Amino acid sequence: MPGDRQALRQSLYRLAAGQAGYFAASQALNVGYSYQAQKYHVDHGNWVRVDRGIFRIPEWPTGLHDSLMRWVLWSKHRAVVSHDSAAAAYGHGLVNPAKVHLTVPLDFRMDDPAVVLHHRVLPEADVRQLDGAAITSVTRTVLDVIESHVDEELVESVIDDALSAGALTAGQLRRRLCELGEAERARAERVLARVAP
């Protein structure tokens, strides 16, 4: 019996390792932890309940982007970290979002006051992984910031940081500007004329 418990724990830890120490109740159930066992582990301090149906291993080292994984699990892996939250995770720009920005499928209906949802179908090429969480690519992130902000200083800070970090070239961004509306495209061109003439 102790070997079974150890095998269960190892399976759960392997799963949590790819998710910044987080896991969902449904994932624990799939590994072999009944709901009663889940309650036991929370009550005895073996797991921390982060939200309804979302847990974390308490001794797991914290990382810079840990909280993003929580929201990906909350969405049942349907959300992609995006917009200001993605820019902040990449360290690009003067963004400091008060809420977590997530891009979700058009039929996504969950909601939480701590998140801002953006409904859009994202092509695979626009999605990356960062510490186990799905996040928009740098190019998609920059386009999202251009679309959602009229403050050119903020937009410029994100574009300039992405270019300076080598995460994006001006040519790559210019090729994708056709995806934006006319006002957003003009804003991006003005910024690019200043930072990448």
Predicted regions, residues:
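Short gly/ser-rich loop at a beta-strand->alpha-helix junction or flexible surface loop bordering the NTP-binding
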Residues: 1-197
